[in-house]
Amino acid sequence: MKNLIANKYATLSLISIMLTAIISASHHVFRDGLGQIVLFLIIILLPYVLIRWFTHTGTKWAVALYGLYNILIIAGLGVVDGFLDHTLKALGFQHTTILPGGEAEVVKTVFSLWSPAAGNSFYEGTGILTFIGSVFATVYLFQFVRTLHQRTEKTAKEQVHGPGEAGA
């Protein structure tokens, strides 16, 4: 990936989606325990693998899979869990998802901090941070894909007109 702007947005997109996945993983491991740790390691590392695949091969399949992965994380973890279950609850709105435990004032967790209030604050806070991270991931994914699309159009025009030729 030689385009510096695309590289910048690819890096920002990768950082934001990986941080969102890390926050969401800590959120769910805190609640459910270490049983899902392998799944979350895959979820955290997959975007890095896809971006590396793209930088080495330039294939559109890597970008398509990376975009699909981002959409699934943003929609599933960011919007449904982070926004509908935790952010709206923190803002005082009623429970709006079908997620288990979402209607509870205090969700039972496997791990605990120094007090139940601190544990609940950590759990709800990481849910809200998952939503915030997904907002950044959405913006940077859009910028990354848009930059790649503009680069592709520019390259196609150069191929049609050739270097140094005046375009019609």
Task: Place the predicted regions along the sequence by residue.
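Membrane-helix interface and helix-disruption motif detector
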Residues: 28-38, 88, 117-125
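Hydrophobic alpha-helical transmembrane segments
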Residues: 104-139
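Transmembrane alpha-helical insertion/packing segments
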Residues: 1-45
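Juxtamembrane non-transmembrane "cap" segments at the membrane-aqueous interface
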Residues: 80-106
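Cytosolic juxtamembrane helix at the C-terminal end of the final transmembrane segment
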Residues: 137-162
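Transmembrane alpha-helical segments of multi-pass membrane proteins
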Residues: 14-18, 64-80, 162-168
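Helical transmembrane-bundle signal
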Residues: 17-24, 70-78, 130-144
